[in-house]
């Protein structure tokens, strides 16, 4: 049996799974997340959960009701959740400089590294790029 690949999920993939305005992306994201649930291989961070709540309740068309958004956050909090702290912030700022990234993208990458994952699902970074031992995969590419 192949070893499961633990995967860090960025906000845009989580949000796409719950955003009805783009059915193609929603289907792809839901399939990816379903597989991670089945394999118990998903990891997330407090940053992702916070951003999801803000996006879902403010940018979805129509916005997700706050109570439902809290339910989704609580559901994904069952996954391993990387807590963002000062050491992670500092490591991300160094990664930001080394790889010419936005601070927020560097913070996602550092959270993925801290969790020990080697795969990051995101549409914000270059598909196929590898940074700090983490392979970037855009499921919508």
Regions found by a protein language model. Give the residues of each.
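General small-molecule cofactor/ligand-binding pocket signal
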Residues: 43, 82, 137
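Alpha-helix C-capping/helix-to-loop hinge sites
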Residues: 17, 35-39, 55-59, 75-80, ...
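Short, well-structured N-terminal submotif of metal-dependent ribonuclease cores
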Residues: 1-44, 59-67, 71
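Acidic, PIN/NYN-like endoribonuclease modules and their adjacent C-terminal/linker elements
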Residues: 1-6, 109-141
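Acidic catalytic patch
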Residues: 46-50, 70-98
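Anionic group-transfer/hydrolysis microenvironments
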Residues: 12-14, 18, 47, 53, ...
